């Protein structure tokens, strides 16, 4: 039984709709076996965690909380490593504290991690020197090396992806439930980069205020800030591979409906969000909060006829926290597109949480052919989004970043002024470029007050 209005929804009803960006597995029998095995494994998250997140997202939609979502474009199996995971949790916790201070709102922290292993690709195949092979679709599908064996979509990797997700979440749960409290104390942060910025004095002042606030609160309550917020960390990934998502979707005792228990908060990518497609069909029947990416491929005058059926399918009951729209228009287009999106949603009479992903509309390729993004474009899209929402009697309720806690060089700009020529020093992403530790922290410092002014 589902709470969804459609009586014909089932865990397999998506199979009757066009499913875009699914790998073509040559061995169908192995796929069936892998999916059957997956369906028997324990879930990675619980329905009560999912419900708790949904109710917090509902409060964010009302302007009472703020969402920080971030992590890799695509996690790699080899990144399932204590340092990589710790660094990512650390930057997200630190950014969240900066945002709490600036916005004066509780911040919901959601990692793009513990399952962000599948990628939609613009082309199903890649050709090099006359050799055509399947594209790399993320580690849960195939391997990046350009040879026949590596690019072969292997259904058993679905199980390897589930296992990596479980290992990651197990470690995260241990970290957030104790021993990580120090990260809330700005005196332990890596702030060497600050002095490279013309805004150094301003940043130092903000960090000092933060430090004082943390100490004040701990003195007042006798509880460490780390302990106060210890359970508030959730996971998300793009709900792309429907074989995987449906195998981990379960009905649970004493609750109505179906929960996708591979993650707390799946989102539907821009390329798979057609209202009559398989992805919307599948996610219309599950109880999790759902994100949908909205990009500039539709013109402003077309957005209404897209949004109406989308919201009817995914958000028929106007349940608080159910639907998040993650707009990713790019700094150059957001002013043209966002007002129309806000109006189109308003016309449906439903409430959604609006989040800005300032990464995916700002991708560019350098002269040397490297995919990158400018720090200032990312900031500009965020600033414009905050302003446009405010002017439209709406509000930006969260931010969605591609970032890492490591010292990579994938995006240009920031306090150290990374240039296109610096990108070769530490470019590790196999897909989209991420903000590094310093750039991510600086971004949080820059946007916190602007969001706060509005709140
Ligand atoms: C992503 O989030 O990595 C992604 C592919 O985004 P979008 O669907 O918005 O292009
Ligand atoms: Co990406």
What are these regions (language model features)?
Residues 52-54, 276-279, 339-341:
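Glycine-rich, charged/polar anion/phosphate-binding loops
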Residues 66-71, 108:
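Short, hydrophobic/glycine-enriched beta-strand segments
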Residues 74-75, 80-330, 373, 381, ...:
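Active-site-facing alpha/beta catalytic cores
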Residues 177-178, 182, 352, 356-360:
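An internal, amphipathic alpha-helical element
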Residues 294-295, 358-362:
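Conserved phosphate/anionic-ligand binding catalytic regions in large, soluble enzymes, centered on
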Residues 303-314, 322-353, 360-409:
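Non-transmembrane, aqueous-exposed alpha-helical and coiled segments at domain scale
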Residues 413-416:
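C-terminal structured domain segments
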